[in-house]
A protein has these predicted regions:
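AAA+ P-loop NTPase catalytic core and its hallmark functional loops
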Residues: 1-212, 217
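General structural signal for secondary-structure boundaries
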Residues: 2, 6-9, 36, 171, ...
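Exposed alpha-helical structural elements
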Residues: 5, 9, 103, 189, ...
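Extended hydrophobic/Leu-rich segments
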Residues: 6, 97-105, 299, 364, ...
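Generic hydrophobic, helix-prone segments enriched in Leu/Val/Ile
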Residues: 10, 100-104, 242, 419, ...
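Amphipathic alpha-helical interaction segments
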Residues: 103, 198, 214, 240, ...
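Alpha-helical lid/collar subdomain of P-loop NTPases
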Residues: 196-359
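Terminal-proximal interaction/regulatory segments of ATP-powered molecular machines
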Residues: 300-507
Length: 507
């Protein structure tokens, strides 16, 4: 199966394992909750989907790479303890708590979440001295004498032997105690992630043209030659940083991530051509509706590779614009909930809205910062939620600073006034994003009509979480018209239904 199907299968298993009866007991007892074994080639996103599942289910998450562990760190250190059996004292061997099990308890204390996922990567690549202990762990969820706490589900991952010389197979008795999920690289599925995650458009459009270069592993006289999804994703992030700093992106950089000489060389050549298209086509002016009159004609007459690159640039700029608006909208919704809670607390303490509320505002700021840091340390903080925390904490800090210079102090009225100013800025940003979306459709209509380029635009907006969130909340007549024409209406409607709606209820 592909990585998206694997994620859904694992998520379904987690939901089932976490299900309790009316007395708070797990319907499937922990001893019968089979650990999941995710088997797949390196760099296809196994670890990433586990972090996503933990965030989506709002449970704890602890991750370990087992190749870094010795028998002592996994099992704990031995020590001599005194026990009494039938009135006779004996000295027996005991073990300190495993570092891995201890990390689970530490995560529970830090986050307050009693349920979670313990993810052990490269489980089939452990040293020979640790192998018996790992097999025991997979069967009984015990390291030494210490078990994984109830409510924590074990998920493991590993590479097939053809990708890792140190990987070894399990016997039938072990496999019969695991939920085995095999994952294969799939470019179409990865592309949906890439569009939504704003992977650099040069990477996406290059792979649209050279799909066989998405994932390749081969043996050469000089060693392994390979390129993986992780490599493309990491290269994308580095290209963005290089561009922001005005640094040169060349073959020397590319081959550090794309460890296949021929593919690295071809992508570096394509990137040079891509940057020329970016300069020529004035993408920002397409979004604001001020592009030169002849630009659409040039795009229509361009060869295939150029049209793919141009559409990649347009989609990337559009999704980035919509994502910015959606993230600010979610931050505003989060801020609204914080203000509503603060208002209730002020009323409960008898503090008027025009009275100094510095103490409570400061306490709220501290609580928010603590929650943010806790979620971040536990790998449970998404980019959207992080921005939401930063926006409201920044607003509260601003009000405290302003209030310190006024006789009235930091009042709730001042806080509401500043928040409403942010809402006005948000409305302007939403209008700008809506205009940009409309302008993009106008340009693609003029240049390509109902051709493959329009199909690419509609499809990529449909798989973009930010794109569908924005369209779902604010509409786009041209999107729905072309979506219906291209027989994607039902798919788009289904995707839209899965997006959390954002509503800002003003006082």
């Amino acid at each position: 199966m592909n990585i998206r199907e694997a994620k859904q299968q694992i998520k379904n298993a987690m939901i089932a394992y976490f299900t309790k009866d009316e007395f708070g007991n797990y319907l499937l007892p922990p001893e019968r909750q089979r650990p999941v074994f995710l088997l797949g080639a390196p760099g296809i996103g196994k670890t990433a989907i586990m972090e996503q599942i933990a965030q989506e289910l709002e449970v704890g998450f602890v991750s370990y790479s087992m190749t870094h562990h010795t028998r002592q760190s996994a099992l704990g250190l031995p020590f001599i303890a005194t026990k009494t059996y039938d009135g006779v004292e004996y000295q027996v061997s005991e073990y300190t708590m495993s570092e891995i099990i201890a990390s689970v308890y530490e995560a529970m204390e830090a986050t307050g979440r009693r349920e979670g996922i313990l993810f052990l990567d490269e489980i089939n690549c452990v040293s020979e001295t640790l192998t018996p202990a790992m097999l025991q762990f997979l069967q009984y969820k015990i390291f030494g004498r210490h078990a994984v706490p109830d409510g924590w589900i074990v998920v493991t991952a590993g590479n097939p032997p053809e990708y890792n010389r140190t990987a070894h197979d399990f016997d039938i008795a072990t496999w019969d105690r695991l939920k085995r999920i095999e994952v294969e690289p799939d470019y179409d599925v990865w592309r949906e992630f890439a569009v939504s995650a704003e992977v650099h458009p040069a990477v996406i459009t290059y792979l649209d043209i050279e799909r066989s270069h998405f994932y390749a592993v081969e043996a050469t006289p000089d060693g392994a030659s390979f390129v993986t999804a992780r490599g493309w994703d990491d290269l994308s992030a580095m290209i963005k940083l290089y561009e922001a700093q005005g640094l040169t992106v060349d073959e020397l950089l590319v081959e550090q991530y794309v460890q296949n000489g021929e593919i690295a060389k071809r992508f570096a050549m394509y990137y040079d051509l891509f940057t020329k298209y970016r300069s020529d086509y004035q993408i920002d002016r397409i979004l604001d509706g001020s592009a030169d009159a002849g630009l659409a004609e040039r795009a229509a007459a361009a060869p295939f590779d150029e049209r793919v690159a141009v559409m990649g640039l347009i989609v990337d700029a559009t999704v980035s614009c919509l994502r910015e608006a959606v993230m600010e909208e979610k931050a505003a919704a989060f801020g609204h909930s914080v203000l509503a809670d603060l208002k209730e607390r002020l009323a409960a303490e008898g503090v008027a809205e025009n009275a100094d509320a510095s103490a409570l505002i400061r306490a709220t700021t501290t609580e928010l910062a603590r929650t943010r840091d806790t979620e971040r340390a536990a790998s449970l903080l998404s980019d959207e939620r992080y921005r939401s925390f930063e926006r409201i904490i920044g607003l509260l800090d601003e009000v405290l600073r302003t209030g310190a210079d006024t006789p009235e102090g930091a009042t709730f009225n001042l806080l509401r006034e500043r928040f409403n100013e942010r809402l006005d800025e948000l409305d302007a940003a939403i209008d700008t994003a809506a205009d940009a979306l409309d302008n993009v459709f106008k340009f693609v209509e003029e240049a390509f009509g109902e051709g493959q380029e329009m199909l690419m635009l509609v499809t990529d907006l449909s798989v973009s979480r930010a794109g569908m969130a924005f369209i779902n909340d604010h509409g786009c007549d041209r999107y729905f018209a072309h979506n219906q024409n291209l027989q994607f209406y039902e798919r788009g409607h289904d995707l839209a239904a899965r997006i959390d709606r954002i509503t800002l209820e003003e006082e």
